[in-house]
From Swiss-Prot:
Residues where Fe cation 1 binds: D100, E131, H134
Covalent S-S links between cysteines: none
Disordered: annotated segments: 1-24
Gene null: resulting phenotype: Mice develop normally until they are weaned but from then on exhibit growth retardation and early mortality. Pathological examination indicates that multiple organs fail and that they die from severe renal failure by the age of 14 weeks.
Enzyme kind, highest EC tier: oxidoreductase
Active-site residues annotated for this sequence: Y138
Name the record gives this protein: Ribonucleoside-diphosphate reductase subunit M2 B
The keyword DNA repair belongs to this UniProt entry's keyword annotation: yes
Reported function: Plays a pivotal role in cell survival by repairing damaged DNA in a p53/TP53-dependent manner. Supplies deoxyribonucleotides for DNA repair in cells arrested at G1 or G2. Contains an iron-tyrosyl free radical center required for catalysis. Forms an active ribonucleotide reductase (RNR) complex with RRM1 which is expressed both in resting and proliferating cells in response to DNA damage.
Residue sites binding Fe cation 2 per the record: E131, E194, E228, H231
Gene Ontology MF annotations: identical protein binding; metal ion binding; ribonucleoside-diphosphate reductase activity, thioredoxin disulfide as acceptor
Localization terms from the record: Cytoplasm; Nucleus
Gene3D superfamilies recorded: Ribonucleotide Reductase, subunit A
Amino acid sequence: MGDPERPEAARPEKGEQLCSETEENVVRSNEEPLLRKSSRRFVIFPIQYPDIWRMYKQAQASFWTAEEVDLSKDLPHWNKLKSDEKYFISHILAFFAASDGIVNENLVERFSQEVQVPEARCFYGFQILIENVHSEMYSLLIDTYIRDPKKREFLFNAIETMPYVKKKADWALRWIADRKSTFGERVVAFAAVEGIFFSGSFAAIFWLKKRGLMPGLTFSNELISRDEGLHCDFACLMFQYLVNKPSEDRVREIIADAVQIEQEFLTEALPVGLIGMNCVLMKQYIEFVADRLLGELGFSKIFQAENPFDFMENISLEGKTNFFEKRVSEYQRFAVMAETTDNVFTLDADF
């Protein structure tokens, strides 16, 4: 379900296939304003897509670094955790540490090369930067909690050492490698990666916050979940600009496939029961997140699921929570979010 590969019997000869695919991709690109080549792609102003530009400025205003996260109080908590809880957290961090690199590979290899709109390229460039911060943060968390070098190496190589992490990674990597899928299909697929594949794990870490555990881990989780929410919102915005969108059935197929993989990951392969969460409710939460994503993409819900976790009500994956707004207000001092017309030069400042 949701496999972007076509049946073997439907494939033409290799040379013919490459030619027809190239021609087809050129036609697709010329039909899509976002993908149409133009010398305008080298110059940002004047802004042609103000809503895309606003999202770039929001991403810029929410920038943070791994050094801002205080992990000094986490180790005493870590040492008091049960072995099941340590197992769950370390394996979730291993998944996350690998995932941000995969997201960046897609941005570098595909999206940044395909999209010709400078406003969107600015966003992707900044997303690559912040995904590197996320990857550094997860690696730092593993490095802090796991003292055994062999265990640490096992976690850092999760794509090779953990079959259930490999399954999620392979799904995402397949979309990067696929040359036959449309840009719209891949936008949906990576919205699913950041909006569905990450959602249950974010919720599990917020569950630890509800219990008053691991303040450094849970704070970094707040920062990263808000970033990923903004990235998911951006994918939905890009999707709305597409002329040739994939069909609703195709979108629902991709989303349902991601839901199935994520549910299996957190209820069978790495069950949230290890930290005291309810697996049935986690399945429901993943369905709720998927329905919300479908709505943002402009389609009807599949699951009609309610949010079963009250502690997630105030945790938005849309980049609009109190912390984000606090960051925006701080950066306002440096005019990061100001309109260019707001920048007035004066000589009457107090020194």
